[in-house]
Amino acid sequence: MYNTTPLNFAINQENNEEVIKYLLANGANPRLALVDIIEAGNNNALNLLMKVAPSITVDEVFPQVMAMGMRRFFQAVQNKDLSAIKDFI
């Protein structure tokens, strides 16, 4: 289970932007949530976080997403999981 921060929990529960903005305004750290969101592969949560947290940029997120994708690809190859490998093609 990821949801290690209140912000990440709120994002994963698909709360509206106002809830997310409230947490950010009251000291929530978007970078802590970012790590869990990327590891969970939750694209909707990632898009929402980038939309409401101006400090999170594509330049910051892209390398982490690529690294996670490569780890998943090599894991799929190691496990000989053809359906997972096809997702990358």
From Swiss-Prot:
ANK repeats lie at residues 2-32. The keyword Zinc does not apply. The keyword Isomerase does not apply. Keywords: ANK repeat. InterPro entries: Ankyrin_rpt, Ankyrin_rpt-contain_sf. It comes from the Bacteria. It holds the Pfam family Ank. This is Putative ankyrin repeat protein RF_1157. It comes from Rickettsia felis (strain ATCC VR-1525 / URRWXCal2). The lineage of its organism: Bacteria, Pseudomonadati, Pseudomonadota, Alphaproteobacteria, Rickettsiales.
